[in-house]
Amino acid sequence: MRVLSARFRVLLACLALVIPVSETNFLSKERASQVLVRKRRANTLFEETMKGNLERECIEELCNKEEAREVFENNPETDYFYPKYLGCLGAFRVGSFHAARQSANAYPDLRSCVKAISDQCDPIPCNEDGYLACQDGQAAFTCFCKPGWQGDRCQYDVNECKDPSNVNGGCSQICDNTPGSYHCSCKRGFAMLPNKKDCKDLDECALKPSVCGTAVCKNIPGDFECECPDGYRYDPSSKSCKDVDECSENMCAQLCVNFPGGYSCYCDGKKGFKLAQDQKSCEGIPVCLSLDLDKNYELLYLAEQFAGVVLYLKFRLPDITRFSAEFDFRTYDSEGIILYAESLDHSNWLLIALRDGKIEVQFKNEFSTQITTGGNVINNGIWNMVSVEELDDSVSIKIAKEAVMNINKLGSLFKPTDGFLDTKIYFAGLPRKVESALIKPINPRLDGCIRGWNLMKQGALGAKEIIEGKQNKHCFLNVEKGSYYPGSGIAQFSIDYNNVTNAEGWQMNVTLNIRPSTGTGVMLALVSGGTVPFALSLVDSRSGTSQDIVVFVENSVVARLEAVSLCSDQQSQLKCNVNRNGLELWTPLRKDVIYSKDLQRQLAVLDKAMKRTVATYLGGIPDISFSATPVNAFYSGCMEVNINGVQLDLDEAISKHKDIRAHSCPSVRKIQKNF
């Protein structure tokens, strides 16, 4: 019983708590039914003919959803409004429960709560960054955009940089679009002007004078460049100009020589190449004048060897035989040995030579020595029949079968031994070193030809077979007076250019008479060690039909005569006078010599070389680097040289290529016309 009594008391306490709460949350029966009852409105006479009004319909009075529809006149807005409207009613008409007020956004009164429901601008439907204002409308809203924005909600940025009415936003260089605006900027190397639209170039060279170091600073729009002379490249790390090694880039066809600021291409002229007009590739040196180089194996050339005997024959004949030699002889040379004969023991000898253009005979036997020079001058370039015959008591010399000399003698020229006459005959030279044994010294070298020889009355026995198969022992058929350079060798002279009577110290006056057969080659050069301090050369002109006469000091051109027609059947004269103070180049064909602007400095280089030992070369340069001078091809053609008033005789040279003809030059080949 006590237990039940306790439980009853607890139940009564719970009911006591529930009853007040229920009274708070639930309306009375009368009040609750009022929501569903439409009160009588004012103006009921015209109510159905007037458009709904939110204030009148739903604030001053309570409205149902149909009446709310009359206010908004569209379903979407009505559907949006009415649930929120009921929330406001629950907050402000029914009671003041705190949670209900929170759900109505804590509006101060019912009117504010209901008014806010239909405001299309609350919450703001516009883009917060782009809108300026929002205007509420019935079932609509209008967003007013800030400058630089567009769209119904101001959600799109206006790209002023692409406005066709204001190209590039009015910026002179870069237009940068930003949300709702834009701004102008400048490229690197430019600065913005106060108008914020135009850019001005910055002169980096003036702002930073040392920006290029030792190079030259050049301002350009928006930037600067560090310039170097041709042949140099700017090195940013050292801020200096470094030489460009063009040769590492295979610029030249044959030899490339790099030097500070440039490079030069060279071709091996000694192999018949010259530098082409592009100054990089090589091409063959063409013949500009054809010479008659035809030879005859029956003509023995006496100057095949610069030093030494051309042909050696030995005869062993009966002791009754006497010496005799008969031959046709042609030369323009004035001095030299035709033949030398001797006994086996060298005790007796006979020399037949030419001195001053006349026949000279020297001999020695066991009884006497004799020398005789006489007769007509026969170095006239035509064939002359010469005979030397030993008689009983004399030696007879005939030219064209006419006796010109008769030399008395005692005994035989050569003494027989054991019933035989042994005789050795040498053509165009002396055996061993017997010059000292001669009665009168003579230059043995002789540029001449013999044919139809009959020695010791044995005809051409032995000699014909020797020379027949050797081209270098054959003579040209047609020659003229002059010196011939075949384009394959040089001649060297030792010349003293110092002039003690001249205040200039040294002088070189050169006169050349030339008839070139190729348009490129070195005519005269001075060589000192591995350098060429002076060279007088021919170079084919750019036209291809004429030649340039060029003077070089080492690798520099100091004088040039352009476009001279030298490849003709007539010889041309050329003069070059030079000393330490000046240079003069002259030819009657042209007067307009081009001299280097740096002539005096280049002459100083030559002057320094002339104070040392220099060797003079004709027809080319020796075997030194063919980069020592721009032209290294051998000269080809006829040429006679006079230096300081002395006519150079190639027979007097220190050395001479065997194919150089000292006193004869092939004639110009005649072109036969077909009729």
Curated annotation (Swiss-Prot):
Q: Which residues form the Laminin G-like domain?
A: 299-475, 484-665
Q: Name one GO molecular function term.
A: calcium ion binding
What region holds the Gla domain? 42-87
Keyword Secreted part of the UniProt annotation = yes
Q: Tell me the SMART domains matching this sequence.
A: EGF, EGF_CA, GLA, LamG
| Disulfide linkage | C58-C63, C121-C134, C126-C143, C145-C154, C161-C175, C171-C184, C186-C199, C205-C217, C212-C226, C228-C241, C247-C256, C252-C265, C267-C282, C449-C475, C638-C665
Q: Name one GO cellular component term.
A: extracellular space
Q: Report the principal subcellular site.
A: secreted
Q: In which tissues is it expressed?
A: Plasma.
User: Where is the PTM (3R)-3-hydroxyaspartate found along the chain?
Assistant: D136
Residue ranges the record assigns to the propeptide: 25-41
Region (Thrombin-sensitive), start-end ranges = 88-116
Q: Where is the signal peptide?
A: 1-24
What is its subcellular localisation? Answer: Secreted
- Residues with an annotated glycan are N499, N509
Keywords linked to the UniProt accession: Blood coagulation, Calcium, Cleavage on pair of basic residues, Disulfide bond, EGF-like domain, Fibrinolysis, Gamma-carboxyglutamic acid, Glycoprotein, Hemostasis, Hydroxylation, Repeat, Secreted, Signal, Zymogen
Chain positions with 4-carboxyglutamate modification: E47, E48, E55, E57, E60, E61, E66, E67, E70, E73, E77
Report the residue ranges that make up the EGF-like domain in this protein.
117-155, 157-200, 201-242, 243-283
| Gene Ontology BP annotations | blood coagulation; fibrinolysis; positive regulation of phosphatidylinositol 3-kinase/protein kinase B signal transduction
Name the CDD domains for this protein: EGF_CA, LamG
**Post-translational modification comment from the UniProt entry:** The iron and 2-oxoglutarate dependent 3-hydroxylation of aspartate and asparagine is (R) stereospecific within EGF domains.
A Pfam family found in this protein is EGF_CA
Q: InterPro entries recorded for this chain?
A: Coagulation_fac-like_Gla_dom (IPR017857), ConA-like_dom_sf (IPR013320), EGF-like_Ca-bd_dom (IPR001881), EGF-like_dom (IPR000742), EGF-type_Asp/Asn_hydroxyl_site (IPR000152), EGF_Ca-bd_CS (IPR018097), GAS-SHBG-PROS (IPR051145), GLA-like_dom_SF (IPR035972)
Known role? Anticoagulant plasma protein; it is a cofactor to activated protein C in the degradation of coagulation factors Va and VIIIa. It helps to prevent coagulation and stimulating fibrinolysis.
Name of the protein this chain belongs to: Vitamin K-dependent protein S
Q: What is the lineage of its organism?
A: Eukaryota, Metazoa, Chordata, Craniata, Vertebrata
